[in-house]
Amino acid sequence: MEGQKTELKIIRMSEVESQEVKWLWYPFIPYGKLTIIQGDPGDGKTTLVLNIAAKLSKGECLDSDMDVQEPVNVIYQTAEDGLADTVKPRLELAGADCEKILVIDESDKSLSMADERLEEALAKTGAKVLILDPIQAYLGGGMDMNRANEARDMTKKLGALAEKYQCAILLIGHMNKASGNKAAYRGMGSIDFFAVAKSVLLVGRIEGEPNIRAVVQIKNNLAAFGHPKAFMLSETGFRWLGDYEITADEVLGGIAPKANKLEQAKQMLRELAETTNMVQSNEIFEMADKQGISKRTLENAKKELGIQAKKINNSWYWELDAVKQR
């Protein structure tokens, strides 16, 4: 017996209304899409997302590129940590408004990615962020995440929820142990998880810096790749460091990053200041580019050294006197 025929429906692109992507954290976490945050166990993924959640609960920004106007509800599901003895103390340490951090009760039945309670919770709470940590625990008993078709169907359903409710869905995943492989293939089982997500962030240790963790974007379908970031873990808690010069290969391979580009940029400016008081900005940018220093890093070095820009005859110059006084 043949199955029921599916009705053909045609969509004319002229009838589709164009929309801009909205961002929670540009260009790392979009609204209405899936974002994967992956890394080895113990490397700080959960600490990062809990601190993001804490900031959002108070209407604050972790990073200057975040767009947070007011406190928002965050749904955080975890299968690895106790709510009372681990999750809440960590949220309190991060300064969260725990009234805004919500959890779907799994005491009667474990939650899965296909569970209708996910949509019910989004509709009821208006949460702008949903976090599943780790995603491996929310597959459901009958799903094999290494089967491409099953992974694709499951993530498409989650993606549809994100789009319908314009929330950011974050999937936290452990890396596998296939050392030397690309990050996409060291992720969460089927490559289809990686394929459906619009943004993928790698969180990992930095060789030679035991208390610092890097955040490197390894996939972005919606914008240019974001600059790598970093945060510090210590006995006193979490501290956001912002921009950091490191690559995904250095994180994955346990390779110490090349000379810190910010320090390299500051040293270049100090050496310039020894021979001149003022240099045209374009010349400085060209010098930095030859040394592999990005414009953004150079601007950060300029700010830290207290250098001022001055316009002369329609050209911009950097005054280096401040560098000599440091």
Model-derived regions: residue spans:
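Conserved beta-strand segments of alpha/beta enzyme cores
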Residues: 100-102, 199, 308
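C-terminal regions of RecA-like/P-loop NTPase motor modules
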Residues: 1-9, 41, 123-126, 164-165, ...
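Conserved inter-motif catalytic segment of the P-loop NTP-binding fold
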Residues: 2-5, 19-20, 24-26, 30, ...
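Gly/Ala-rich phosphate-binding loop of Rossmann-like dinucleotide-binding domains
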Residues: 57
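Hydrophobic positions on the alpha1 helix immediately C-terminal to the Walker A/P-loop
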Residues: 48, 52
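Phosphate-binding/switch region of NTP-binding enzymes
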Residues: 36-37, 42, 47, 74-77, ...
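Conserved hydrophobic/aromatic pocket- or pore-lining residues that grip, position, or stack substrates
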Residues: 29, 37, 53, 76, ...
